[in-house]
Protein backbone atom coordinates (compact mmCIF):
# COMPACT_ATOMS: atom_id res chain seq x y z
CA UNK A 1 0.00 0.00 0.00
CA UNK A 2 1.24 3.48 -0.87
CA UNK A 3 0.83 6.60 1.26
CA UNK A 4 -0.97 9.53 -0.33
CA UNK A 5 -0.72 13.05 1.11
CA UNK A 6 -2.93 16.05 0.43
CA UNK A 7 -0.46 18.67 -0.77
CA UNK A 8 -1.55 22.26 -0.08
CA UNK A 9 0.75 23.37 -2.90
CA UNK A 10 -1.14 21.41 -5.57
CA UNK A 11 -4.47 21.12 -3.74
CA UNK A 12 -4.68 17.40 -4.41
CA UNK A 13 -3.64 14.09 -2.93
CA UNK A 14 -0.32 12.86 -4.24
CA UNK A 15 1.58 9.63 -3.87
CA UNK A 16 4.28 10.13 -1.25
CA UNK A 17 7.73 9.60 -2.71
CA UNK A 18 10.55 10.91 -0.50
CA UNK A 19 13.75 12.20 -2.04
CA UNK A 20 15.78 9.39 -0.51
CA UNK A 21 14.50 5.83 -0.29
CA UNK A 22 13.27 4.95 3.21
CA UNK A 23 14.25 8.39 4.57
CA UNK A 24 11.96 11.34 5.30
CA UNK A 25 13.02 14.92 6.02
CA UNK A 26 10.22 16.68 7.89
CA UNK A 27 10.01 20.23 9.28
CA UNK A 28 7.16 21.37 11.53
CA UNK A 29 6.90 25.00 12.60
CA UNK A 30 7.11 25.20 16.39
CA UNK A 31 5.81 27.74 18.90
CA UNK A 32 6.84 31.25 19.86
CA UNK A 33 7.65 30.63 23.51
CA UNK A 34 6.19 33.66 25.27
CA UNK A 35 3.31 31.92 27.09
CA UNK A 36 1.71 28.54 27.73
CA UNK A 37 0.30 26.86 24.63
CA UNK A 38 -3.46 26.57 24.12
CA UNK A 39 -5.16 23.55 22.57
CA UNK A 40 -5.03 25.17 19.12
CA UNK A 41 -1.24 25.37 19.41
CA UNK A 42 -1.19 21.73 20.54
CA UNK A 43 -2.98 20.33 17.50
CA UNK A 44 0.02 20.52 15.10
CA UNK A 45 2.41 18.71 17.48
CA UNK A 46 -0.13 15.91 17.99
CA UNK A 47 -1.10 15.63 14.32
CA UNK A 48 2.40 15.61 12.91
CA UNK A 49 3.78 13.45 15.69
CA UNK A 50 1.19 10.90 14.54
CA UNK A 51 2.29 11.35 10.92
CA UNK A 52 5.87 10.75 12.01
CA UNK A 53 4.92 7.67 14.03
CA UNK A 54 3.07 6.15 11.10
CA UNK A 55 5.94 6.82 8.71
CA UNK A 56 8.29 5.13 11.18
CA UNK A 57 5.88 2.21 11.49
CA UNK A 58 6.03 1.87 7.69
CA UNK A 59 9.81 1.60 7.88
CA UNK A 60 10.95 5.15 7.16
CA UNK A 61 13.83 6.80 9.00
CA UNK A 62 12.27 10.17 9.84
CA UNK A 63 14.44 13.20 10.54
CA UNK A 64 11.93 15.45 12.31
CA UNK A 65 12.83 19.07 13.02
CA UNK A 66 10.62 21.47 14.97
CA UNK A 67 11.88 24.89 16.03
CA UNK A 68 11.39 27.31 18.90
CA UNK A 69 11.06 31.02 18.16
CA UNK A 70 12.74 32.38 21.28
CA UNK A 71 13.09 36.03 20.24
CA UNK A 72 10.15 37.94 18.82
CA UNK A 73 7.93 41.01 19.31
CA UNK A 74 5.64 39.00 21.62
CA UNK A 75 8.57 37.84 23.74
CA UNK A 76 9.94 41.37 24.00
CA UNK A 77 6.50 42.66 25.03
CA UNK A 78 6.15 39.91 27.66
CA UNK A 79 9.63 40.67 29.00
CA UNK A 80 8.79 44.36 29.37
CA UNK A 81 5.47 43.60 31.10
CA UNK A 82 6.99 41.10 33.54
CA UNK A 83 10.24 42.95 34.16
CA UNK A 84 12.30 39.94 33.05
CA UNK A 85 14.72 39.36 30.22
CA UNK A 86 13.77 37.56 27.01
CA UNK A 87 15.97 34.45 27.54
CA UNK A 88 14.47 33.82 31.00
CA UNK A 89 10.91 33.90 29.65
CA UNK A 90 11.84 31.78 26.63
CA UNK A 91 13.52 29.12 28.79
CA UNK A 92 10.51 28.95 31.10
CA UNK A 93 8.02 28.39 28.29
CA UNK A 94 10.23 25.98 26.34
CA UNK A 95 10.19 23.81 29.46
CA UNK A 96 6.42 24.28 29.83
CA UNK A 97 5.92 23.35 26.17
CA UNK A 98 7.83 20.09 26.60
CA UNK A 99 5.79 19.24 29.71
CA UNK A 100 2.52 19.83 27.86
CA UNK A 101 3.25 18.01 24.60
CA UNK A 102 4.98 15.11 26.37
CA UNK A 103 1.83 14.65 28.45
CA UNK A 104 -0.11 14.61 25.17
CA UNK A 105 2.02 11.72 23.91
CA UNK A 106 4.34 13.62 21.54
CA UNK A 107 7.89 12.41 21.08
CA UNK A 108 10.74 14.91 21.02
CA UNK A 109 11.84 15.97 17.56
CA UNK A 110 15.17 14.78 16.21
CA UNK A 111 16.25 18.40 16.67
CA UNK A 112 14.52 21.33 18.39
CA UNK A 113 16.58 24.30 17.12
CA UNK A 114 16.23 27.69 18.74
CA UNK A 115 16.54 30.95 16.84
CA UNK A 116 18.99 32.48 19.32
CA UNK A 117 21.32 29.49 18.89
CA UNK A 118 21.36 29.84 15.10
CA UNK A 119 21.83 33.56 14.61
CA UNK A 120 25.00 33.14 12.54
CA UNK A 121 23.35 31.01 9.86
CA UNK A 122 20.31 33.31 9.77
CA UNK A 123 22.47 36.39 9.18
CA UNK A 124 24.46 34.49 6.55
CA UNK A 125 21.22 33.48 4.79
CA UNK A 126 20.05 37.11 4.68
CA UNK A 127 23.42 38.30 3.38
CA UNK A 128 23.26 35.76 0.54
CA UNK A 129 19.80 37.05 -0.44
CA UNK A 130 21.14 40.61 -0.46
CA UNK A 131 24.09 39.54 -2.60
CA UNK A 132 21.75 37.87 -5.11
CA UNK A 133 19.52 40.94 -5.39
CA UNK A 134 16.52 39.43 -3.59
CA UNK A 135 16.81 41.64 -0.52
CA UNK A 136 17.72 45.22 0.33
CA UNK A 137 18.72 47.22 3.39
CA UNK A 138 16.68 50.23 4.46
CA UNK A 139 17.83 52.24 7.50
CA UNK A 140 18.99 49.18 9.43
CA UNK A 141 16.11 46.93 8.36
CA UNK A 142 16.45 44.33 5.59
CA UNK A 143 13.48 43.40 3.40
CA UNK A 144 12.83 40.63 0.91
CA UNK A 145 12.12 42.02 -2.57
CA UNK A 146 8.94 40.08 -3.33
CA UNK A 147 8.53 41.21 -6.94
CA UNK A 148 11.87 39.58 -7.79
CA UNK A 149 10.55 36.12 -6.90
CA UNK A 150 8.40 34.93 -9.77
CA UNK A 151 6.51 32.20 -7.91
CA UNK A 152 5.22 34.31 -5.03
CA UNK A 153 1.66 33.31 -4.12
CA UNK A 154 1.85 29.73 -5.41
CA UNK A 155 1.19 28.10 -2.02
CA UNK A 156 -1.79 30.30 -1.13
CA UNK A 157 -2.96 30.24 -4.78
CA UNK A 158 -3.37 33.99 -4.90
CA UNK A 159 -2.26 36.23 -7.80
CA UNK A 160 0.44 38.65 -6.70
CA UNK A 161 -1.69 41.60 -7.86
CA UNK A 162 -4.45 40.58 -5.44
CA UNK A 163 -1.97 40.12 -2.62
CA UNK A 164 -0.45 43.53 -3.27
CA UNK A 165 -3.90 45.14 -3.31
CA UNK A 166 -4.59 43.84 0.20
CA UNK A 167 -1.17 44.70 1.61
CA UNK A 168 -0.07 47.97 3.17
CA UNK A 169 3.01 49.63 4.57
CA UNK A 170 2.81 50.07 8.34
CA UNK A 171 3.91 53.25 10.09
CA UNK A 172 7.67 53.18 10.52
CA UNK A 173 8.29 50.63 7.78
CA UNK A 174 10.69 51.68 5.06
CA UNK A 175 10.07 49.11 2.36
CA UNK A 176 9.78 49.56 -1.40
CA UNK A 177 6.65 47.46 -1.91
CA UNK A 178 3.73 46.66 0.41
CA UNK A 179 4.35 42.93 -0.13
CA UNK A 180 8.01 43.08 0.89
CA UNK A 181 8.60 41.52 4.30
CA UNK A 182 11.26 41.93 6.96
CA UNK A 183 14.27 39.63 7.06
CA UNK A 184 16.07 41.74 9.68
CA UNK A 185 14.68 44.34 12.07
CA UNK A 186 16.80 47.15 13.45
CA UNK A 187 16.81 47.14 17.25
CA UNK A 188 14.82 49.77 19.11
CA UNK A 189 16.14 51.39 22.26
CA UNK A 190 16.45 48.86 25.07
CA UNK A 191 15.59 45.81 22.93
CA UNK A 192 17.60 42.60 22.79
CA UNK A 193 19.86 42.63 19.71
CA UNK A 194 22.62 40.90 17.73
CA UNK A 195 25.35 42.51 15.66
CA UNK A 196 24.97 42.20 11.89
CA UNK A 197 26.29 43.79 8.66
CA UNK A 198 23.26 46.12 8.85
CA UNK A 199 23.71 47.12 12.48
CA UNK A 200 22.18 45.92 15.73
CA UNK A 201 18.92 44.02 15.39
CA UNK A 202 17.17 40.65 15.24
CA UNK A 203 15.70 38.46 12.50
CA UNK A 204 12.19 38.53 11.10
CA UNK A 205 9.96 35.55 11.79
CA UNK A 206 9.91 33.97 8.32
CA UNK A 207 13.66 33.83 7.72
CA UNK A 208 14.25 31.83 10.89
CA UNK A 209 12.48 28.70 9.65
CA UNK A 210 14.06 28.88 6.19
CA UNK A 211 17.55 29.09 7.66
CA UNK A 212 17.09 26.36 10.26
CA UNK A 213 15.31 23.99 7.86
CA UNK A 214 18.23 24.35 5.45
CA UNK A 215 20.83 23.83 8.18
CA UNK A 216 19.33 20.62 9.53
CA UNK A 217 17.56 19.14 6.49
CA UNK A 218 19.25 20.58 3.40
CA UNK A 219 18.04 22.66 0.46
CA UNK A 220 14.99 20.48 -0.27
CA UNK A 221 12.86 18.73 2.34
CA UNK A 222 10.13 16.15 1.93
CA UNK A 223 7.36 17.43 4.22
CA UNK A 224 6.83 20.91 5.64
CA UNK A 225 3.92 21.17 8.04
CA UNK A 226 2.08 23.49 10.40
CA UNK A 227 -1.26 25.03 11.23
CA UNK A 228 -3.57 26.30 8.50
CA UNK A 229 -3.00 29.86 9.70
CA UNK A 230 0.68 29.59 8.72
CA UNK A 231 0.08 28.90 5.02
CA UNK A 232 0.04 32.64 4.33
CA UNK A 233 2.11 34.63 4.84
CA UNK A 234 4.59 32.51 6.83
CA UNK A 235 4.98 29.47 4.60
CA UNK A 236 4.54 31.50 1.43
CA UNK A 237 7.42 33.70 2.53
CA UNK A 238 9.55 30.69 3.47
CA UNK A 239 9.18 29.36 -0.07
CA UNK A 240 10.16 32.73 -1.54
CA UNK A 241 13.28 33.10 0.61
CA UNK A 242 14.50 29.53 0.29
CA UNK A 243 13.87 29.05 -3.42
CA UNK A 244 15.27 32.49 -4.26
CA UNK A 245 18.48 31.53 -2.50
CA UNK A 246 18.95 27.95 -3.70
CA UNK A 247 17.02 27.82 -6.97
CA UNK A 248 15.62 24.48 -5.78
CA UNK A 249 12.22 23.30 -4.57
CA UNK A 250 12.06 24.10 -0.85
CA UNK A 251 9.49 21.48 0.23
CA UNK A 252 7.80 18.80 -1.87
CA UNK A 253 4.71 18.23 0.29
CA UNK A 254 2.96 20.92 2.32
CA UNK A 255 0.60 19.78 5.08
CA UNK A 256 -1.68 22.05 7.12
CA UNK A 257 -4.03 21.13 9.98
CA UNK A 258 -7.40 22.81 10.53
CA UNK A 259 -8.55 25.19 13.24
CA UNK A 260 -10.16 24.44 16.60
CA UNK A 261 -13.53 25.93 17.56
CA UNK A 262 -14.78 26.19 21.14
CA UNK A 263 -18.49 25.35 21.44
CA UNK A 264 -18.95 26.10 17.72
CA UNK A 265 -17.15 29.45 17.97
CA UNK A 266 -13.66 30.07 16.61
CA UNK A 267 -11.11 29.99 19.42
CA UNK A 268 -9.23 33.25 19.86
CA UNK A 269 -7.56 35.21 22.60
CA UNK A 270 -9.64 38.27 21.70
CA UNK A 271 -12.83 36.33 22.50
CA UNK A 272 -11.27 34.96 25.66
CA UNK A 273 -12.41 31.43 24.81
CA UNK A 274 -9.02 29.75 24.48
CA UNK A 275 -8.08 26.79 26.68
CA UNK A 276 -4.52 26.32 27.90
CA UNK A 277 -3.13 22.81 27.63
CA UNK A 278 -1.60 22.87 31.12
CA UNK A 279 -5.10 23.59 32.50
CA UNK A 280 -7.10 21.08 30.46
CA UNK A 281 -4.73 18.16 31.20
CA UNK A 282 -5.35 18.70 34.91
CA UNK A 283 -9.07 18.25 34.28
CA UNK A 284 -8.94 15.45 31.71
CA UNK A 285 -6.61 12.56 30.92
CA UNK A 286 -4.09 13.85 28.31
CA UNK A 287 -4.57 10.59 26.41
CA UNK A 288 -8.26 11.45 26.04
CA UNK A 289 -7.35 14.89 24.63
CA UNK A 290 -5.12 13.24 22.03
CA UNK A 291 -7.71 10.58 21.18
CA UNK A 292 -10.31 13.33 20.78
CA UNK A 293 -8.04 15.38 18.49
CA UNK A 294 -7.27 12.37 16.31
CA UNK A 295 -10.94 11.40 16.02
CA UNK A 296 -11.28 14.14 13.39
CA UNK A 297 -9.28 14.25 10.13
CA UNK A 298 -6.37 16.64 10.59
CA UNK A 299 -7.42 18.98 7.75
CA UNK A 300 -10.91 19.44 9.17
CA UNK A 301 -11.84 21.90 11.93
CA UNK A 302 -12.51 20.48 15.39
CA UNK A 303 -15.34 21.63 17.61
CA UNK A 304 -14.09 21.34 21.19
CA UNK A 305 -16.72 21.00 23.91
CA UNK A 306 -17.02 19.13 27.19
CA UNK A 307 -20.02 17.16 25.89
CA UNK A 308 -18.06 15.93 22.88
CA UNK A 309 -15.06 15.19 25.07
CA UNK A 310 -17.20 13.09 27.41
CA UNK A 311 -18.75 11.23 24.49
CA UNK A 312 -15.28 10.49 23.15
CA UNK A 313 -14.20 9.31 26.60
CA UNK A 314 -17.04 6.79 26.65
CA UNK A 315 -15.76 5.34 23.38
CA UNK A 316 -12.16 5.26 24.55
CA UNK A 317 -13.17 3.50 27.76
CA UNK A 318 -15.03 0.85 25.75
CA UNK A 319 -11.81 0.01 23.93
CA UNK A 320 -9.79 0.03 27.14
CA UNK A 321 -12.35 -2.19 28.84
CA UNK A 322 -12.16 -4.70 26.00
CA UNK A 323 -8.38 -4.63 26.32
CA UNK A 324 -8.62 -5.17 30.09
CA UNK A 325 -11.02 -8.08 29.60
CA UNK A 326 -8.63 -9.67 27.11
CA UNK A 327 -5.71 -9.35 29.53
CA UNK A 328 -7.83 -10.83 32.31
CA UNK A 329 -8.96 -13.77 30.16
CA UNK A 330 -5.43 -14.59 29.02
CA UNK A 331 -4.63 -16.55 32.18
CA UNK A 332 -7.64 -18.83 31.83
CA UNK A 333 -7.26 -19.36 28.07
CA UNK A 334 -5.89 -22.61 26.69
CA UNK A 335 -3.82 -23.75 23.73
CA UNK A 336 -7.05 -24.33 21.82
CA UNK A 337 -6.52 -24.39 18.04
CA UNK A 338 -10.06 -24.92 16.73
CA UNK A 339 -11.48 -21.94 14.82
CA UNK A 340 -8.39 -19.77 15.50
CA UNK A 341 -7.96 -19.03 11.80
CA UNK A 342 -11.44 -17.51 11.57
CA UNK A 343 -10.76 -14.94 14.30
CA UNK A 344 -7.18 -14.23 13.21
CA UNK A 345 -8.35 -13.64 9.63
CA UNK A 346 -10.84 -11.04 10.86
CA UNK A 347 -8.06 -9.32 12.80
CA UNK A 348 -5.98 -9.13 9.63
CA UNK A 349 -8.88 -7.37 7.89
CA UNK A 350 -8.96 -4.73 10.64
CA UNK A 351 -5.20 -4.26 10.33
CA UNK A 352 -5.46 -3.75 6.58
CA UNK A 353 -8.36 -1.31 6.97
CA UNK A 354 -6.44 0.66 9.62
CA UNK A 355 -3.42 1.00 7.33
CA UNK A 356 -5.60 1.91 4.35
CA UNK A 357 -7.08 4.74 6.41
CA UNK A 358 -3.65 6.02 7.43
CA UNK A 359 -2.30 5.63 3.89
CA UNK A 360 -5.13 7.90 2.73
CA UNK A 361 -3.71 11.23 3.93
CA UNK A 362 -3.31 9.99 7.52
CA UNK A 363 -7.06 9.65 8.10
CA UNK A 364 -6.95 9.02 11.84
CA UNK A 365 -10.74 9.36 12.09
CA UNK A 366 -11.25 6.25 9.95
CA UNK A 367 -8.32 4.52 11.63
CA UNK A 368 -9.97 4.98 15.03
CA UNK A 369 -13.14 3.39 13.63
CA UNK A 370 -11.03 0.26 13.13
CA UNK A 371 -9.98 0.38 16.78
CA UNK A 372 -13.65 0.22 17.74
CA UNK A 373 -14.11 -2.67 15.32
CA UNK A 374 -11.22 -4.59 16.90
CA UNK A 375 -12.63 -4.01 20.40
CA UNK A 376 -16.16 -5.06 19.38
CA UNK A 377 -14.85 -8.15 17.65
CA UNK A 378 -12.74 -9.03 20.69
CA UNK A 379 -15.81 -8.71 22.92
CA UNK A 380 -17.64 -11.17 20.66
CA UNK A 381 -14.76 -13.61 20.98
CA UNK A 382 -14.81 -13.32 24.76
CA UNK A 383 -18.38 -14.66 24.71
CA UNK A 384 -17.01 -17.98 23.46
CA UNK A 385 -17.15 -20.76 26.06
CA UNK A 386 -13.49 -21.61 25.49
CA UNK A 387 -10.87 -19.14 24.28
CA UNK A 388 -7.44 -19.65 22.77
CA UNK A 389 -4.39 -18.00 24.24
CA UNK A 390 -3.07 -17.48 20.69
CA UNK A 391 -6.14 -15.47 19.67
CA UNK A 392 -6.27 -13.50 22.93
CA UNK A 393 -2.59 -12.58 22.60
CA UNK A 394 -3.16 -11.54 18.98
CA UNK A 395 -6.00 -9.19 20.00
CA UNK A 396 -3.87 -7.69 22.78
CA UNK A 397 -0.89 -7.17 20.49
CA UNK A 398 -3.04 -5.67 17.74
CA UNK A 399 -4.67 -3.13 20.05
CA UNK A 400 -1.30 -2.20 21.58
CA UNK A 401 0.31 -1.78 18.14
CA UNK A 402 -2.47 0.35 16.67
CA UNK A 403 -2.69 2.52 19.77
CA UNK A 404 1.08 3.01 19.73
CA UNK A 405 0.98 4.18 16.09
CA UNK A 406 -1.46 6.90 17.17
CA UNK A 407 0.72 7.83 20.15
CA UNK A 408 -1.77 6.40 22.62
CA UNK A 409 -1.47 4.03 25.57
CA UNK A 410 -3.94 1.40 26.70
CA UNK A 411 -3.02 1.21 30.37
CA UNK A 412 -5.89 2.22 32.64
CA UNK A 413 -5.36 4.02 35.93
CA UNK A 414 -6.29 1.93 38.96
CA UNK A 415 -9.76 2.77 40.24
CA UNK A 416 -10.02 4.32 43.70
CA UNK A 417 -12.15 2.52 46.31
CA UNK A 418 -14.76 5.28 46.26
CA UNK A 419 -14.98 5.09 42.45
CA UNK A 420 -15.62 1.33 42.67
CA UNK A 421 -18.30 1.83 45.34
CA UNK A 422 -20.00 4.48 43.18
CA UNK A 423 -20.11 2.12 40.19
CA UNK A 424 -21.49 -0.70 42.34
CA UNK A 425 -24.24 1.63 43.59
CA UNK A 426 -25.02 2.59 39.98
CA UNK A 427 -25.25 -1.14 39.15
CA UNK A 428 -27.61 -1.77 42.08
CA UNK A 429 -29.89 1.03 40.88
CA UNK A 430 -29.80 -0.38 37.34
CA UNK A 431 -30.90 -3.80 38.61
CA UNK A 432 -33.69 -2.25 40.66
CA UNK A 433 -34.87 -0.52 37.48
CA UNK A 434 -34.58 -3.86 35.63
CA UNK A 435 -31.93 -2.33 33.35
CA UNK A 436 -29.96 -5.56 33.21
CA UNK A 437 -27.96 -4.50 30.15
CA UNK A 438 -26.46 -1.57 32.09
CA UNK A 439 -25.95 -3.80 35.13
CA UNK A 440 -24.01 -6.34 33.07
CA UNK A 441 -21.99 -3.61 31.34
CA UNK A 442 -20.87 -2.15 34.68
CA UNK A 443 -19.93 -5.63 35.92
CA UNK A 444 -17.95 -6.34 32.73
CA UNK A 445 -16.28 -2.92 32.81
CA UNK A 446 -15.15 -3.52 36.39
CA UNK A 447 -13.94 -6.98 35.45
CA UNK A 448 -11.88 -5.39 32.70
CA UNK A 449 -10.33 -3.17 35.35
CA UNK A 450 -9.48 -6.29 37.39
CA UNK A 451 -12.32 -5.75 39.90
CA UNK A 452 -14.29 -8.91 40.71
CA UNK A 453 -17.87 -8.58 41.99
CA UNK A 454 -19.66 -11.15 44.12
CA UNK A 455 -23.41 -10.80 44.64
CA UNK A 456 -24.46 -12.19 48.05
CA UNK A 457 -27.57 -12.10 50.24
CA UNK A 458 -25.89 -9.35 52.22
CA UNK A 459 -25.18 -7.25 49.13
CA UNK A 460 -22.42 -6.90 46.54
CA UNK A 461 -18.85 -7.50 47.60
CA UNK A 462 -15.79 -6.73 45.53
CA UNK A 463 -12.11 -7.51 45.43
CA UNK A 464 -9.16 -6.64 43.24
CA UNK A 465 -8.11 -9.52 40.97
Swiss-Prot record:
Location(s) in or outside the cell: Cytoplasm
Modified residue annotations for Phosphoserine: 270
Residues where Zn(2+) binds: 29, 209, 234, 238
Database matches in Pfam families: DALR_2 (PF09190), tRNA-synt_1e (PF01406)
Details of cofactor binding: Binds 1 zinc ion per subunit.
Binding site for ATP: 269
Keyword Electron transport: no
Single GO BP term: cysteinyl-tRNA aminoacylation
Its EC number(s): 6.1.1.16
Cofactor(s) listed in the protein's UniProt record: Zn(2+)
Keyword Lyase among UniProt keywords: no
Single GO term (MF): cysteine-tRNA ligase activity
A GO-annotated cellular component: cytosol
Ranges spanned by the short sequence motif 'KMSKS' region, renumbered to the chain: 266-270
Reaction equation(s) it catalyzes: tRNA(Cys) + L-cysteine + ATP = L-cysteinyl-tRNA(Cys) + AMP + diphosphate
Subunit-level organization: Monomer.
Name of the protein described by the UniProt record: Cysteine--tRNA ligase
Amino acid sequence: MTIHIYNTLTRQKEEFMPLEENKVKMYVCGPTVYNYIHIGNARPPMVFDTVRRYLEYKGYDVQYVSNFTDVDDKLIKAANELGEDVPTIADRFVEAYFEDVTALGCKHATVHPRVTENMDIIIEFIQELVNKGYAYESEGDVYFKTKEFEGYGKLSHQPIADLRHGARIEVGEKKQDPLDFALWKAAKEGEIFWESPWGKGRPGWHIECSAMARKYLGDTIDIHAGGQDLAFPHHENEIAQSEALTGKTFARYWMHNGYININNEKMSKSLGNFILVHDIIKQYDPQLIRFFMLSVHYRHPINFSEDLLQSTNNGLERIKTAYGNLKHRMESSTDLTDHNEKWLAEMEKFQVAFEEAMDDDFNTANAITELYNVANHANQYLLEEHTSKVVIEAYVKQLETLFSILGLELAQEELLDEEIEALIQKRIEARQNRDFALSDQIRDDLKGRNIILEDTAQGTRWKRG
